[in-house]
Amino acid sequence: KYALPTHGLITNCGKAHLEGFGGEEGVKKGKGELFDYLRNNSGTAFIFNDYGYLSEMSKGISNIITYGTIDADLNGEAIKESGSEFLRVKIGKGVTINEINTQLVGGYNLPNVLAAVCIGKTFGVDDEQIIAALENYIPSNSRSQLIEKDSNRIILDAYNANPSSMKAAIENFANMPGNKKVLMLGGMMELGDESMTEHENLVKLINQNQWHKVVLVGKDYKDLPVSFIHFYDVSDARNWFREQHFMDALILVKGSRSMQMEKVLE
């Protein structure tokens, strides 16, 4: 045991590191060890109420504080009419904060914002400090960064990727305003026996929308029957990208950490 937590939060149990954990149930079991400790030591768990499996995993914990979009101690929702790439959050119940204008890209960051507010209030942080911290935070290190380059807007989300985060990123990207959308996606690692199936599912998801260009990078796509542009190596994708001279495009760059997809922008 490396820590003896009094409070704990599991953001989600997505399809990440399936190879090491032996599947989704293994992921839940591994992450659930945090809740096991809290349950046995009268700890407090923060639960995102929208994910029913987290509520199930937290049963028996004596102190539970919930956040989410419905029926939670702290309620909030994304303001969808904002017309901006950035996430705006309206808080409906639980605090006196009304609205938070973040510099985060993607509605998939809503649970993270609500979790931060919920934890801050639990530990007595002033509303003004919570708002300032969230509104002034600018993502870095290839984590949902919004970059403006040569009249293009680039979402660099290349820190890591798994089927769950890829789905969230692509669906959010599809709903963003913009007519010239370019997908540049690297492979998803550590999926074990599920790798082929999950990459096939990703291609099916891509095909649900119209894109200006789709570029897939890595060996994981080599056996898939796709009509998209494919490169084995990031350096080849970078050379292709340089030759396109895109203007006024909206570009999503995402892939697992080992793919180093940020190099396509060098």
Pin down the residues of each PLM region.
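Glycine/threonine-rich flexible loop motifs
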Residues: 19-25, 166, 192-196, 262-263
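Active-site beta-alpha connecting loops in nucleotide-dependent enzymes
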Residues: 139-142, 158-229, 256
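Acidic, Mg2+-coordinating active-site environments of NTP-dependent enzymes
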Residues: 5-153, 178-179, 204-207, 211-213, ...
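Peripheral docking tails and interdomain loops at the edges
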Residues: 230-233, 248-266
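Short amphipathic alpha-helix with an adjacent loop that forms part of the alpha/beta core around
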Residues: 1, 237-247
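Short acidic-hydrophobic, aromatic-tinged amphipathic segments that line or gate anion-handling sites
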Residues: 228-240
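Short, well-ordered alpha-helical microsegments
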Residues: 54-55, 238, 261-262
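Short beta-strands and strand-loop turn motifs
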Residues: 9-14, 48, 182-188, 217-218, ...
